[in-house]
Structures are given as C-alpha cells and as structure tokens.
C-alpha cells in the first residue's frame, strides 16, 4: 500500500458510525490520544500516525493471521455470535501461550483479501486476527485503554 492511506478506504460495513456521539466520541478520542502518546506519537504527527496504523496490515509482525468472514445475509444477532467466537478463539490461543490481536481495520481491505483468498461472494470480510508471540515490552502492548465504570453502562438487579 505504498503511498495510499488505508484509513480512507471504506469497509463494506461501518466500523464506526459516521457521526459518533457522546460519551463514545470522547472515549474514542481519549483512547487514541493515550495510545499514540504511549508510542511517543504526537497528535500533529500525521506521518507517524499513518505509519503506526499501517502496521495493522503487517499484522504487527505476527507470523500467523486469520481472516474472519460472515455470511452477508446474517444480522446483528449472528454478528454478536461471531464476536463471541472470536473472543473464545483468542482466549484459547492465550491458553497455548499465544498472543492475539483482533483487527477490524482489515475490513477496509475486503476487495484485496477477497481476491487473495478467493472468498465466495456471499461472504463478507469482518476482520483479521493476528496470532503470534507478542512483544510485551512494546509500549502499545503495555497500554490499557481507559474503562468506564460499570455503573455508566449497566444496571445490576438482584445482587445484594
């Protein structure tokens, strides 16, 4: 992808809503500021930010990657099931000493990937999952995104 900014390629589905609203907009922005800050990349350093984003398409140097697709006719419930499957796969890999990274950014590369893997037309690329041995000393791997308090997004009933 030399000379091409993959952030401007549309995925087949919206990875994020076109107009993010609060509190999600602020949370997403804060996550970006903190992650790129941990990497020593300033907000105004567009070239370094793009270079870091492009590392997605090298699977962050992982030796193995999976492309995950979903049948185009399936709806939100099945997409939730797919997320659960991916999550389980990632936990299982961890049990074998492997690290993983789910990469929805690959959804933007659906044409390239579809052609490369000869994906049937009824399938839609959802994401990739990089699998390997993480560099735990890398600042991105020590970074933890801020978390909202559970009381901000859920209610518990029937618990003491």
Where would I find each of the regions flagged by the language model?
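Acidic, surface-exposed loops and disordered segments
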Residues: 1-160
């Amino acid at each position: 992808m030399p000379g091409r900014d993959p952030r401007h390629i549309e995925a087949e589905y919206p990875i994020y809503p076109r107009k993010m609203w609060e509190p999600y907009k602020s949370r997403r922005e804060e996550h970006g500021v903190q992650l790129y800050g941990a990497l020593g990349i300033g907000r105004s350093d567009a070239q370094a930010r793009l270079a870091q984003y492009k590392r997605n398409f090298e699977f962050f140097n992982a030796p193995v990657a999976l492309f995950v697709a979903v049948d185009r006719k399936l709806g939100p419930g099945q997409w939730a099931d797919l997320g659960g499957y991916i999550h389980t796969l990632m936990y299982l890999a961890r049990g074998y000493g492997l690290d993983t990274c789910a990469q929805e950014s690959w959804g933007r590369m659906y044409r390239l990937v579809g052609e490369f893997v000869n994906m049937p037309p009824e399938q839609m690329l959802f994401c990739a999952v990089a699998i390997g041995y993480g560099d735990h000393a890398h600042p991105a791997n020590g970074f933890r995104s801020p978390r909202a308090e559970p009381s901000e997004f859920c209610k518990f009933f029937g618990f003491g």
